[in-house]
Amino acid sequence: MKKTVYLFAMIAAFAASFLACDSSNDSESELTPDQKNQNYQSEVDSKFSQRWTAEERRLANTAASASYLSQVEKEVYYYLNLLRIDPPRFAETYAKDYRGVLGWINGYGFDERQQSLIQQLATLSPMPLLRPNEMLFYSAECFASNGGKLGKVGHDRSGPGCEQNVGLAECVACGGYVTGLSVVMDLLVDAGEGNALLGHRRILLDEHYEWMGVAVRDHRDFQHMVVMSLDSREL
């Protein structure tokens, strides 16, 4: 009788454990791609944040007080500035860990270009921090808003307003960008058949650009449109 009771208890415990694991997996599978990307950013921040001092993280957060920027837009400055503080350290942490925007197919040449990014960052010296600029922001915001509504995917600013980018350089991307880290890393990797010259990467790693405007707005076909206007001058 005791053996029967013991066996029943073992079976019950195993069943409870199995159900708990199954429930956990169901909960994970129910997350949307946006939630998975947000969780990923939180996880890698927990994993790598101690590689930068509190003072370095404070310095990187140049857009913290820019009330006209969204949280995601502020994060773009933060991660780009962590890179600019110490490119090799960024290469060994965030750049090496990145796997693309979850729920979206990585562009052509993603793996090779990620490796070339890591190798390039390992050779770079610190750069001036990027700072927010309202004129550059409004130039970026106008194009992101109008371009997103019209379904634009490139640098063609033709249409109502926003014909001229006031900055010296511009980056444009469309996709499931719900975190600043995904914006920064996708543009740095610069995957895609039309990005063989790595134009976005070259702009973001150009030490002459110290001022930037960033806007992330809804896109008609591809969830979000990101526009970044950069300049060497404070406009």
Show the residue positions of the predicted features.
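Intrinsically disordered, low-complexity peptide-like regions
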Residues: 4, 20-24, 35, 131, ...
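A periodicity- and composition-biased signal for non-globular, repetitive helical segments
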Residues: 8-9, 90
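A well-ordered secondary-structure block
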Residues: 138, 142-234
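Bacterial Sec-dependent N-terminal signal peptides
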Residues: 16-55, 63
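Bacterial N-terminal signal peptides
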Residues: 9-17
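Bacterial N-terminal signal peptides that target proteins for export
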Residues: 1-8
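Short, well-ordered surface patches within globular domains
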Residues: 64-165, 201, 207
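Short alpha-helical hairpin
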Residues: 47-59, 109-116
